[in-house]
């Protein structure tokens, strides 16, 4: 391969790789080993933006910080852009150095030499800079800085241009077969997309939907789409995204969803396009616990043969798998892992790096602990399209991902374990515990703080000591607890680095007596936007995306995002939507008489037609209380089934299997709004013919909800809406949406709470609910009977 400067050829395929991904991919070797904190330290080095800024700011005005560098390397069929961002470039005594900064919790004075891949990263930047500036010599500086003490250690090396050029040429030679393969794969993909047509006849309004998505991608914007059930949202987002890739508007599609069923639909949609001539690599990332072949996920060469020598074999395993499979399934990953004796989960992640379409959970893109660093860790914008399904889940999920907490009691647990192993760690834990004890004594129910400053410095000191100890530690009783604590504390400190005006820091004395400190991300919009900025465009879509301005404000910081409402193709005459006017689930109204009325409503609906019904409650307590009354009064008329807390996968499947289309007795299933059956289940046709939603779904009052309310009262005067009403109505809409899954379905939806007729709720309903009807306990039976008669 030869360098082509930055003059692109029109004939050759354009490829890209980051400097970091290049060196980590080529130079990895040896075992997976989670027994020490070495792997953890590598992650810690990726953090520490505060240290980066501080070091860069202290180096004087001649120091250039965050210097973007790129080089086009020419192959026979392709031009490969190698790109990245050097932490710093400076000149000293007439010599030029490229600086690579790494923050960590380890004591830097213990470093005898730089980490190999860090050195290789700096050498890549040094070569590019030397080549583009006609330099005869170039130096690199590795700057390691302790995040707690800010103690710094430097390593310097100097190279002639000939030396560093030979090193870089050898590196690119090693990567050559991968670049050639990627080029051939991309050319096949692009040619196939040109000939690809929409695989169905367009439904009414669907062609406009496809055009809106394509236009969003073309303009590199964000789109928020309210997409009612039945509009074909999966194909209507995937197809235009694929066509956009064919037009070189992007290079990779991430389809993100929190539910297995929607991931399966996405996979089936890509497979359908493949049957129609589309040629691309598609993979669904499976959770580690579902891929790990071991009873315990102990990722080390002693307990797991797949971990021993994993990095020596995994590149060959990936190369072989990519040559054999287009649609890469879980079974393909498992069999390939067996064939090459490599970790199936790591194989899955590595294979995803070479795939055109990646179907995965939100956390693989957004979670700061889990995100796919091979795609998102560099400061370079990727050619990615994000298709984010069931996006109403993103608000709460992102709050969880960008928040962190620690418990005082865990410090004491680890202190007892470490007493036998390290006096210095025991003392550091004792110091942290004393600080937490003082905060606990001052805390009533919960306390909000402006800063955790002094305490965080004590946590950093503890992290340094733990990191050093775990580097050398063999097995000892309680080590797993210590490792878990290490991860929790490290996450807390990493999240603390993100804390700004979008966070609330508070302590809470929980009901069981445990004392918690929390960094609560009340507004995740900035953190999400930073990750979205790593791609070209994003489409958020959901069947329950109302009010859309609420989601726009919490999922992005941009003010020029698009929003559309896809027209429903469903015939509203095939669905009865009724809302009660004479029942309430307010706390002040909850009583046996009110529960008897609710049970009466349920019976009046389900006895009009034999079939399967679901009733959704705001809590297990109310569900059980109403179930007792329902059994007393109506047990002989129907079969009753209740959702249980913490159901296993097998129990969930058994629950859903009871919903048969061919039944001669009515089944009534009680479940929880917002729970495992409240959304994400797909009971089509006559498997479910009615849903009754009890209450407005308001989250239970808690300290966290109070903090949210106070924050948004101050922010925009909508505290109750943001903390309670909007999350509640989403659960209601999701539960109601279990009935109508296709344009052929028929069914009854009944909402039981007089508050549903208030103006505040009236403004939140989808357009398709304009035909809602009032009802009461006296006439609801006739209303439902008349509906079934006209059907």
Segments the model singles out, each with a brief description of its role:
Residues 184-226:
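Conserved pre-motif I regulatory segment
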Residues 581-593, 644-757:
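Conserved RecA-like P-loop NTPase helicase motor core
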Residues 218-240:
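Walker A/P-loop
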Residues 237, 264, 338-357, 361-464, ...:
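Signature of the SF2 helicase/ATPase Hel1-core->accessory helical subdomain module
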Residues 1-96, 120:
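Metal-dependent nuclease catalytic cores that hydrolyze phosphodiester bonds in DNA/RNA
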């Amino acid at each position: 391969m030869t360098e082509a400067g930055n003059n692109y050829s029109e004939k050759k395929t354009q490829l890209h790789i980051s400097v970091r991904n290049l060196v980590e991919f080529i130079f990895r070797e040896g075992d997976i080993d989670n027994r020490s904190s070495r792997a953890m330290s590598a992650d810690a080095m990726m953090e520490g933006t505060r240290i980066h800024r501080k070091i860069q700011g202290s180096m004087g005005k001649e120091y250039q910080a965050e210097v973007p560098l790129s080089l086009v390397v020419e192959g026979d069929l392709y031009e490969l852009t190698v790109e990245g961002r050097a932490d710093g470039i400076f000149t000293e005594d007439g010599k030029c150095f490229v600086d690579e900064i790494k923050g960590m919790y380890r004591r830097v004075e213990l470093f005898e030499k730089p980490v190999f891949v860090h050195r290789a990263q700096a050498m890549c930047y040094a070569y590019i800079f030397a080549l583009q500036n006609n330099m005869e010599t170039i130096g690199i500086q590795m700057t390691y800085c302790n995040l707690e003490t800010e103690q710094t250690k430097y390593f310097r090396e100097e190279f002639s241009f000939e030396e560093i050029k030979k090193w870089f040429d050898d590196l690119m030679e090693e990567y050559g077969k991968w670049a050639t393969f990627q080029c051939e794969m991309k050319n096949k993909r692009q040619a196939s997309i040109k000939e690809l047509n929409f695989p169905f006849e367009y439904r009414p309004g669907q062609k406009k939907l496809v055009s809106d998505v394509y236009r969003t991608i073309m303009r590199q914007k964000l789109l928020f789409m309210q997409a009612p059930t039945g509009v074909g949202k999966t194909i209507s987002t995937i197809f235009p995204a694929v066509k956009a890739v064919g037009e070189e508007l992007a290079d990779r599609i991430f389809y993100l969803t929190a539910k297995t069923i929607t991931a399966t639909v996405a996979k089936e949609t890509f497979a359908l396009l493949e049957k129609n001539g589309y040629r691309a690599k598609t993979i669904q990332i499976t959770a580690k616990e579902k891929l790990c072949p071991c009873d315990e996920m102990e990722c080390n060469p002693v307990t797991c043969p797949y971990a021993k020598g994993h990095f020596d074999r995994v590149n060959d395993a990936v190369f072989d798998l990519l040559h054999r499979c287009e649609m890469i399934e879980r079974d393909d990953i498992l069999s390939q892992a067996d064939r090459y004796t490599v970790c199936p989960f790591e194989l899955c992640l590595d294979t995803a790096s070479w795939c055109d379409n990646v179907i995965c959970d939100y956390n693989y893109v957004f979670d700061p602990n889990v995100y796919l660093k091979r795609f998102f860790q560099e400061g370079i914008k990727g050619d990615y399209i994000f298709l984010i399904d069931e996006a109403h889940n993103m608000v709460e999920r992102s709050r969880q991902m960008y928040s962190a907490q620690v418990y005082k009691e865990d410090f004491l647990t680890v202190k007892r374990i470490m007493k036998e192993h390290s006096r210095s760690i025991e003392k550091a834990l004792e110091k942290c515990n004393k600080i937490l004890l003082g905060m606990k004594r001052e805390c009533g129910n919960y306390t909000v703080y402006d800063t955790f400053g002094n305490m965080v410095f004590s946590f950093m000191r503890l992290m340094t000591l733990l990191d050093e100890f775990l580097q050398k530690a063999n097995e000892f009783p309680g080590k797993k607890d210590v490792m878990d604590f290490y991860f929790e504390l490290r996450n807390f400190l990493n999240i603390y680095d993100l804390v700004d005006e979008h966070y609330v820091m508070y302590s809470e004395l929980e009901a069981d007596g445990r004392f918690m400190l929390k960094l609560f991300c009340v507004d995740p919009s900035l953190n999400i936007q930073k990750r979205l900025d790593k791609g070209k465009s994003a489409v958020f879509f959901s069947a329950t995306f109302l009010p859309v301005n609420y989601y726009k404000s919490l999922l992005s910081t941009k003010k020029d995002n698009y929003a559309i409402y896809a027209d429903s193709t469903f015939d509203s005459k095939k669905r009865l939507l009724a809302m009660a006017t004479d029942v309430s689930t307010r706390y002040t109204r909850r009583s046996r008489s009110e529960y008897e009325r609710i049970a009466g409503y349920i019976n009046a609906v389900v006895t009009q037609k034999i079939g399967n019904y679901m009733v959704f409650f705001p809590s297990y307590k109310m569900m059980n209380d109403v179930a007792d009354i329902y059994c007393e009064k109506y047990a002989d008329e129907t079969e009753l089934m209740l959702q249980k807390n913490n159901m296993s996968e097998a129990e969930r499947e058994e629950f859903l299997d009871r919903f048969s289309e061919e039944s001669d007795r009515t089944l009534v299933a009680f479940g929880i709004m917002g729970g495992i059956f409240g959304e994400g289940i797909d009971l089509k046709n006559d498997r479910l013919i009615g849903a009754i939603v009890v209450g407005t779904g308001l989250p239970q009052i808690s300290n966290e909800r109070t903090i949210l309310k106070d924050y948004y009262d101050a922010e925009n005067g909508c505290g109750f809406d943001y903390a309670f009403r909007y999350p509640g109505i989403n659960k209601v809409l999701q539960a109601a949406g279990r009935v109508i899954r296709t344009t052929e379905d028929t069914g009854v939806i009944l909402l039981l709470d007089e508050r549903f007729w208030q103006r505040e709720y009236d403004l939140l309903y989808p357009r398709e609910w304009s035909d809602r009807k009032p009802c009461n306990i006296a006439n609801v039976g006739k209303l439902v009977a008349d509906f079934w008669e006209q059907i």
